[in-house]
Regions:
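Positively charged n-region of N-terminal signal peptides that target proteins for export
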Residues: 1-4, 18, 123
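Sec-dependent N-terminal signal peptides
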Residues: 5-14
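Bacterial Sec-dependent N-terminal signal peptides
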Residues: 13-41
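Short beta-strand segments of immunoglobulin-like
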Residues: 33-35, 40-55, 97
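A structural signal for beta-rich interaction modules in eukaryotic proteins
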Residues: 46, 118, 132-134
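Surface-exposed binding patches on compact interaction domains or structured appendages
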Residues: 52-107
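C-terminal edge beta-strand
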Residues: 106, 129-145
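A short beta-strand micro-motif common to beta-rich folds, especially ectodomain repeats
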Residues: 115-129
Length: 145
């Protein structure tokens, strides 16, 4: 009886030891390469005429766009979800921007504004258990940055 109990204990012990690992969730933060510089207020500044912004993830081969939000200064925030196309890379189209992921490349196209107030946009991305976000501030026609 003692031999059976010892044998059972030795068979079960590896399951307890292997399930107590710290490796789950230890994802490196996403690292990006781009020619666009983020300002000290943590925004990518966009002129009223809009523009295209390209970001290259250097440490993950792919990721997907999770959500996008947009807001006018002192206005209500609107949230948008991605359009999935047969499990291909996701894209999001809002009233003011389009964000698309292709492999390790994120392309954000911001439309021109016709509003006097500044517009604020955020694009959120995910690769497994690691998340990142891109904040854009588009200057209004009658407001400086």
């Amino acid at each position: 009886m003692k031999k059976n109990l010892l044998l059972l204990f030795l068979m079960v012990l590896p399951f307890f030891v292997s399930s107590c690992s710290d490796e789950d969730g230890d994802w490196d933060p996403m690292k990006w390469k781009t020619e666009v510089k983020k300002s000290s207020d943590d925004y990518f500044h966009v002129p009223p005429q809009g523009g295209n912004y390209v970001f290259y993830c250097t440490n993950y081969s792919s990721f997907w766009v999770v959500s996008a939000t947009e807001k006018i200064a002192r206005g209500e925030e609107k949230r948008f979800s991605p359009n999935y196309d047969d499990n291909k890379d996701a894209s999001i189209t809002t009233d003011w921007l389009t964000a698309k992921s292709e492999g390790n490349i994120l392309t954000v196209t911001i439309q021109p504004t016709t509003q006097d107030a500044n517009r604020f946009m955020k694009v959120e991305v995910e690769a497994g258990d690691v998340f990142d976000e891109f904040n854009f501030k588009q200057r209004g026609l009658k407001v400086g940055l």
